[in-house]
């Protein structure tokens, strides 16, 4: 009876062996990355076995399904959890919940004369199968069919990554069919919650790739941070070499400014590595420049630029250590070395005798106890309007004297009083004839012209003088113009290195008008010159408060026809001396 039924069903099956009309239905699958099938089929591994009863029952079900499809009756074959069919010794495993609604199941689960071989892919340690697709081999005259997989592993040859981070698949050169990407393999997915249409399928492999990418990016950022923090070099003995190493380091990470004795160098580098932590002297130098005041910082830079010029005299001073060592070697018979060193000292003293002598006298000046008390009392507390000195039609109050404290700006009264002291000293023998204008002279001349200051020289003939001093006040800065009538030149001296060509031209025109008025003669302007002293020719201030002191000391040295050899570090001493000189109306 069973044989007759099998023959009938076989006849019906042969009549139905043709493609089913219509498109294939959807496959609803819920599988993890560990249930991917293998691409390789090895027929030698499994020996052939005789058909069993369960294979026959499965063939009957397939025949009924094909018959129902032929006559148009709706029919569904729902597999139970883990349904296994053995046909010629091959075992097919399908997850629970899978629905097969087209003729592909007939081709997949073939009849007794077929041999379909499925092999599960080996699982990798991360739970992802190494084989992303399944291949079904049919021994009958049916063409080979390939069931595309719905996921790719990172080890798959068909998996590639674009520079933008998106994934796409390439065709396998060994396969005759073209594989489609995962996004295109499934175009629809029915939601379990009564989904509302089309959405992109969820893929565990994709989540793993995204996590892997995020992890790589996080590690890259950590490496960049570690490279930025760990790029500092240990301090070396040489300061210049350490600065050079730090400069090379900062060139690769951002922009860097180096300020060395007033010279400023800026390196521009890509903006994305702009800010980097550094250690060492360069960082402290930058922080000092960042938080310093604007004016004081500018003056400090200018002063540092010419610090070497102010210390030239110190470099030329005889080395006392050499002299002491030479004397200690007298008993050792090194007379030749001693003679050479003594000759060097003599040459240095011959080259700069007056400069060294003047500087030493200034530095070796000592105040007595009485002088110290007078100076401290004048600079101490008291009524600011109290008059402490009166001469030259000027009155100096306690408030005026207190401008001589360290880091205070001098006012007009103190500067005018000191200029008059210089004029009084010039009346002594051995000093050049000197005249000094008030600090209000130049502003009046500039605003009102010659007629506004015509009477300022009523009792003085400027052309009988040898030197004429004109203090200049430019907003918040003091400078000096020296008219040397002997050399027919005007010199502008500025402790900040500024130029005063326009000021010299105005004063030269004043001399021309003065000559016409007092002597009825014109000056030969071709014989006169004016010149702004360059910063390396005169001492420069290193702060923002000693411009008035520099102006007074310029006038002091020039009125004695002495070279200007003082430096910034002598300003506290000069301030104390000026207090005593104004109180006693006498220059020391």
UniProtKB/Swiss-Prot annotation:
Task: Describe the processing and modification events after translation.
Answer: Polyubiquitinated; which leads to proteasomal degradation.
Q: Please provide the record's free-text comment about the domains of this protein.
A: The N-terminus is necessary and sufficient for nuclear envelope targeting.
Q: What is known to happen upon mutating residue 547 to A? A: Abolishes protease activity
* Stretches assigned to coiled coil: none
- Organ and tissue specificity: Highly expressed in testis. Detected in brain, heart and thymus.
EC code: 3.4.22.-
**One term under GO cellular component:** cytosol
| Species this protein is from | Mus musculus
Q: What is this protein called?
A: Sentrin-specific protease 2
Task: Provide the assembly information.
Answer: Binds to SUMO2 and SUMO3. Interacts with the C-terminal domain of NUP153 via its N-terminus. Interacts with MTA1.
- What GO terms describe the biological role, i.e. biological process, of this protein? fat cell differentiation; heart development; labyrinthine layer development; mRNA transport; negative regulation of DNA damage response, signal transduction by p53 class mediator; negative regulation of protein ubiquitination; negative regulation of signal transduction by p53 class mediator; positive regulation of protein ubiquitination
Principal EC category? hydrolase
Pinpoint motif Nuclear export signal by residue range.
316-331
Q: Where is the composition biased (Polar residues)?
A: 172-184
Chain positions of motif Nuclear localization signal? 28-31, 47-52
Q: Which PROSITE patterns match?
A: ULP_PROTEASE
Concerning InterPro entries, the annotation shows:
Papain-like_cys_pep_sf (IPR038765), Peptidase_C48_C (IPR003653)
Q: List the disulfide bonds.
A: none
Region of interest called Disordered, as start-end residue ranges on this chain: 157-184
Family according to the record: Belongs to the peptidase C48 family.
Looking at the record, which segments are called Protease?
394-558
Q: Phosphoserine modification sites?
A: 32, 332, 343
Residues forming the catalytic site: 477, 494, 547 (nucleophile)
Q: Which UniProt keywords apply?
A: Activator, Cytoplasm, Cytoplasmic vesicle, Hydrolase, Membrane, mRNA transport, Nuclear pore complex, Nucleus, Phosphoprotein, Protease, Protein transport, Thiol protease, Transcription, Transcription regulation, Translocation, Transport, Ubl conjugation, Ubl conjugation pathway, Wnt signaling pathway
């Amino acid at each position: 009876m069973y044989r007759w039924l099998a023959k009938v069903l076989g006849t019906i099956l042969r009549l139905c062996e043709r493609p089913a009309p219509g498109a294939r239905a959807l496959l609803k699958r819920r599988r993890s990355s560990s249930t991917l099938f293998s691409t390789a089929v090895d027929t030698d591994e499994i020996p052939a076995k005789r058909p069993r009863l369960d294979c026959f029952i499965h063939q009957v079900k397939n025949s009924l399904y094909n018959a129902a499809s032929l006559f148009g009756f709706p029919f569904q074959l729902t597999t139970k959890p883990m349904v296994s069919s053995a046909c010629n010794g091959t075992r097919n495993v399908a997850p629970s919940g899978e629905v097969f609604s087209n003729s592909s199941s007939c081709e997949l689960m073939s009849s007794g004369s077929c041999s379909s071989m499925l092999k599960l892919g080996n699982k990798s340690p991360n739970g992802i199968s190494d084989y992303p697709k399944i291949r079904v081999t049919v021994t009958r005259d049916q063409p080979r069919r390939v069931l595309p997989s719905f996921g790719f592993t990172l080890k798959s040859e068909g998996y590639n990554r674009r520079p933008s981070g998106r994934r796409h698949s390439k065709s396998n050169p060994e396969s005759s069919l073209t594989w489609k990407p995962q996004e295109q393999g499934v175009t629809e997915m029915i939601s379990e919650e009564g989904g509302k249409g089309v959405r992109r399928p969820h893929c565990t492999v994709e989540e793993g790739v995204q996590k892997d990418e995020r992890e790589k990016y996080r590690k890259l950022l950590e490496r960049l941070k570690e490279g930025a923090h760990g790029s500092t070099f240990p301090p070396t003995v040489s300061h210049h070499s350490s600065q050079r190493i730090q400069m090379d380091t900062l060139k690769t990470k951002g922009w860097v400014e180096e300020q060395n004795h007033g010279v400023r160098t800026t390196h521009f580098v890509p903006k994305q590595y702009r800010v980097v932590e550094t250690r060492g002297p360069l960082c402290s130098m930058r922080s000092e420049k960042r938080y310093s005041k604007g004016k004081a910082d500018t003056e400090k830079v200018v002063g540092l630029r010419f610090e070497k010029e102010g210390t030239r005299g110190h470099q030329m001073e005889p080395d006392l250590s050499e002299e002491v060592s030479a004397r200690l070697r007298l008993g050792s018979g090194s007379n030749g070395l001693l003679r050479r060193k003594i000759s060097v000292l003599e040459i240095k003293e011959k080259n700069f005798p007056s400069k060294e002598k003047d500087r030493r006298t200034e530095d070796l000046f000592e105040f007595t106890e009485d002088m110290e008390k007078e100076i401290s009392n004048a600079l101490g507390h008291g009524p600011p309007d109290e008059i402490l000195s009166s001469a030259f039609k000027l009155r100096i109050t306690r408030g005026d004297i207190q401008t001589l404290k360290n880091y205070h700006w001098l006012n007009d009264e103190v500067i005018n009083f000191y200029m008059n002291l210089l004029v009084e000293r010039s009346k002594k023998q051995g000093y050049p004839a000197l005249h000094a204008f008030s600090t209000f002279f130049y502003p009046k001349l500039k605003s009102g012209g010659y007629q506004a200051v015509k009477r300022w020289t009523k009792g003085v003939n400027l052309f009988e003088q040898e030197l004429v001093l004109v203090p200049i006040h430019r907003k918040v800065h003091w400078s000096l113009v020296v008219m040397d009538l002997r050399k027919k030149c005007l010199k502008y001296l500025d402790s900040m290195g500024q130029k005063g060509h326009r000021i010299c031209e105005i004063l030269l025109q004043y001399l021309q008008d003065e000559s016409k008025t007092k002597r009825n003669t014109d000056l030969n302007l071709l014989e006169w010159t004016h010149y702004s002293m360059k910063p390396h020719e005169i001492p420069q201030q290193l702060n923002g408060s000693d411009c008035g002191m520099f102006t007074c000391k310029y006038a002091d040295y020039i009125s004695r026809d002495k070279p200007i050899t003082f430096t910034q570090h002598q300003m506290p001493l000069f301030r104390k001396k000026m207090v005593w000189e104004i109180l006693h109306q006498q220059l020391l």
